[in-house]
From Swiss-Prot:
GO biological process: translation
Source organism (scientific name): Pelobacter propionicus (strain DSM 2379 / NBRC 103807 / OttBd1)
Claim: Ribosomal protein is one of the keywords in the record: yes
Gene for this chain: rplV
Keywords: Ribonucleoprotein, Ribosomal protein, RNA-binding, rRNA-binding
Protein name: Large ribosomal subunit protein uL22
InterPro entries: Ribosomal_uL22, Ribosomal_uL22_bac/chlpt-type, Ribosomal_uL22_bac/org-type, Ribosomal_uL22_CS, Ribosomal_uL22_sf
Length: 111
């Protein structure tokens, strides 16, 4: 049985978040959570919370053995970009892009 969870409009760069997500793809859920626990990246904490949410969704669906779950698919899509301007010298302005991410995960209990 599969369960999924989504996290939308997270104020993290999709490029940096993909580095963390690639480390847990295909792993058993407990191993993935242990991997994320020791990563220094800010996105690791959010991905960990998302995995725990997907596990809770699986329990709600009636999965009996939660320890047998593994990360079937996990991916990061780019969200909307917040655009800001920074005043510069001589009346000019520089554009500042603040990217957002959408993270989706699917857990499954059968390989």
């Amino acid at each position: 049985m599969e369960s999924s969870a989504k996290l939308t409009s997270v104020r993290l760069s999709p490029r940096k978040t993909r580095l963390v997500v690639d480390l847990v793809r295909g792993k058993v859920i407990q191993e993935a959570l242990n991997t994320l626990r020791f990563l220094p990246q800010p996105s690791a904490k959010l991905v960990s919370k998302l995995l725990q949410s997907a596990v809770a969704n699986a329990e709600q669906k009636g999965v009996s053995d939660v320890d047998a779950l593994y990360v079937k698919t996990i991916y990061v899509d780019g969200g909307s970009v917040l655009k800001r301007f920074l005043p510069r010298a001589m009346g000019r302005a520089s554009k500042i892009r603040k990217p957002t991410s959408h993270i989706s995960v699917t857990l499954s209990d059968s390989k």
